[in-house]
Amino acid sequence: MAVFLCPPNKELSLTGSTFHVHPKSTPLGWPRSITLLLKSLAAAVGNRVIAVILSGMGADGSAALMAVKASGGRILVQSGAPYGSMPRYAIETGLVDRILTPSQIAADLVNCCKLIDRQTV
């Protein structure tokens, strides 16, 4: 398992095994940084993607959930988010696997990693 952090005012995508850092695009409306990243992850790593949608504004990420689901990935969404529009839009897609508190999301990710480790041994 790996965790990657995006630099401020940038966007990330993955092609093959290489992350690419892009200048932040600013189309009309809300940015689509999470949508770009999730679509590229689904294409690059398939069923190993776990999309986690946390508190946030707008619908960023929701447009990519079909790609995550089609690749066999999992989708987790934060319940009780202080800024709930990103989780709400994700839930409205009908593609979400689990709606959890942040601590439950952390535990679920740990369990997923343990399962992956067992499968790769």
Language model: regions and residue ranges:
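Conserved acid/base catalytic micro-environments in cytosolic active-site loops
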Residues: M1-V121
